């Protein structure tokens, strides 16, 4: 068994939507990023890579590379999952928490779960996506950005 933990944060910028868990959510701002800014999938990718001791997404998809400019984070997550499989591990479960004052996440949580389950090749009952606010405290509470935490549990695949 392996456990991985990931964290990501992106600041708000001009825009009219954010992408979280591969779901486009209308909002008064976008997220500043080299890729599509999906903090949920970035935190999850870091958790998966950490669990198999391969570092972080910045190592594989550097923001200094034009190759990854505007990248679809679902594609990045699928690439990370392939590396996890190549290391001989499979997902037991995923638990994530989006930290944001806005936009409201509840209407979009199920679609996020389904996207993640599809990209990881696991049943949806192994994927948890939760959301919380910081009661208007800190940078997320002031509406300056969105953060996400992710934890994964992996098990060795029988050869």
Swiss-Prot record:
Enzyme type, top EC level: lyase
UniProt site positions, description: Transition state stabilizer: 34, 133
UniProt-recorded Gene Ontology molecular function terms: 2-C-methyl-D-erythritol 2,4-cyclodiphosphate synthase activity; metal ion binding
Key words, A-Z: Isoprene biosynthesis, Lyase, Metal-binding
Q: Which GO terms describe its biological process?
A: isopentenyl diphosphate biosynthetic process, methylerythritol 4-phosphate pathway; terpenoid biosynthetic process
Q: Which residues bind a divalent metal cation?
A: 8, 10, 42
Which EC number applies? 4.6.1.12
Question: Any S-S bridges, and between which cysteines?
Answer: none
The record, for Pfam families, names: YgbB
CDD domains to which the protein is assigned, alphabetical: MECDP_synthase
Q: Which residues bind 4-CDP-2-C-methyl-D-erythritol 2-phosphate?
A: 8-10, 34-35, 56-58, 100-106, 132-135, 139, 142
Q: In which pathway does it act?
A: Isoprenoid biosynthesis; isopentenyl diphosphate biosynthesis via DXP pathway; isopentenyl diphosphate from 1-deoxy-D-xylulose 5-phosphate: step 4/6
What reaction does this catalyse?
4-CDP-2-C-methyl-D-erythritol 2-phosphate = 2-C-methyl-D-erythritol 2,4-cyclic diphosphate + CMP
Q: PANTHER family given for it?
A: 2-C-METHYL-D-ERYTHRITOL 2,4-CYCLODIPHOSPHATE SYNTHASE, CHLOROPLASTIC
Give a short account of what the protein does: Involved in the biosynthesis of isopentenyl diphosphate (IPP) and dimethylallyl diphosphate (DMAPP), two major building blocks of isoprenoid compounds. Catalyzes the conversion of 4-diphosphocytidyl-2-C-methyl-D-erythritol 2-phosphate (CDP-ME2P) to 2-C-methyl-D-erythritol 2,4-cyclodiphosphate (ME-CPP) with a corresponding release of cytidine 5-monophosphate (CMP).
Q: How does it assemble?
A: Homotrimer.
What family, per the record? Answer: Belongs to the IspF family.
Q: What is this protein called?
A: 2-C-methyl-D-erythritol 2,4-cyclodiphosphate synthase
Provenance organism: Marinobacter nauticus (strain ATCC 700491 / DSM 11845 / VT8) (Marinobacter aquaeolei)
């Amino acid at each position: 068994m392996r456990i991985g933990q990931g964290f990501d944060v992106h600041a708000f910028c001009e825009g009219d939507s954010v992408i979280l868990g591969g779901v486009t959510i209308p909002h008064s701002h976008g997220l500043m990023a080299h890729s599509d800014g999906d903090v949920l999938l970035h935190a999850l990718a870091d958790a998966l890579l950490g669990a198999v001791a391969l570092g972080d997404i910045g190592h594989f998809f550097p923001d200094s590379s034009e190759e990854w400019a505007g990248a679809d984070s679902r594609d990045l997550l699928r690439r990370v999952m392939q590396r996890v499989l190549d290391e001989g591990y499979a997902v037991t479960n995923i638990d994530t928490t989006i930290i944001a004052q806005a936009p409201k996440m509840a209407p979009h949580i199920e679609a996020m779960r389904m996207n993640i389950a599809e990209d990881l090749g696991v049943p949806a009952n192994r994927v948890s996506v939760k959301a919380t606010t910081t009661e208007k405290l800190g940078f997320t509470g002031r509406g300056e950005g969105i953060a996400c935490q992710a934890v994964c549990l992996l098990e060795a695949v029988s050869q």
